[in-house]
């Protein structure tokens, strides 16, 4: 028999957008080198490189997908900033990243999973405008799958739409 799936229905009010002055395009990314198997291990990291990225794909842009990753120096990254939600509504969110947070709420937690296909999609009611965003990427071989081969993207789908769309650079700010 197949695995039982539990679906929780929760009535939500729209999470209000943030009033932020002087935003610039992109996200702030902090990257640390080392082999980390879970988010808690990142607290031990002492050397972080800070940069600005225009797109979530830049988290692992220098990795040649579908090639050997033996030459890749292991690293993990945290990208923070804001996501601009185009209109009020309930949004379904999907990602193969380790974690995705919106407005300080952990929405996607792929801890302990092979990051090949997201199994922890979720939804949240969001008002139009800027919302805090945090994306955690753990670069490693987890469950036999190199996370470096994943696209470090987030997909959104408004509840009245049929298809997910990528979060695009014009939606990201810091």
For the regions a protein language model found, what residue spans apply to each?
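Extracellular/secretory pathway-exposed regions associated with glycan biology
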Residues: 8-90, 95-174
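Edge beta-strands of extracellular beta-sandwich domains
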Residues: 2-7
């Amino acid at each position: 028999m197949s695995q039982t799936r539990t679906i929780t229905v929760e009535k939500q009010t729209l999470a209000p957008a943030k009033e932020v002055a002087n935003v610039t395009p992109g996200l702030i990314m902090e990257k640390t080198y080392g082999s980390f198997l879970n988010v808690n291990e990142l607290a031990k990291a002492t050397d972080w490189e800070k940069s600005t990225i225009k797109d979530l794909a830049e988290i692992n842009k220098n990795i040649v997908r579908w090639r050997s990753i033996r030459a890749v120096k292991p690293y993990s990254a945290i990208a923070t900033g804001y996501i601009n939600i185009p209109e009020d509504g309930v949004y379904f969110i999907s990602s193969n990243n380790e974690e995705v947070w919106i407005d300080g709420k952990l929405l996607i937690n792929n801890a302990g999973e092979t990051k090949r296909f997201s199994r922890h999609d979720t939804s949240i009611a969001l008002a139009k405008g800027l919302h805090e965003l945090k994306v955690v990427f753990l670069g490693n071989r987890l469950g036999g799958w190199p996370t470096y081969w994943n696209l470090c993207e987030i997909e959104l789908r408004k509840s009245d739409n049929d298809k997910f769309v990528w979060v695009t650079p014009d939606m990201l700010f810091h």
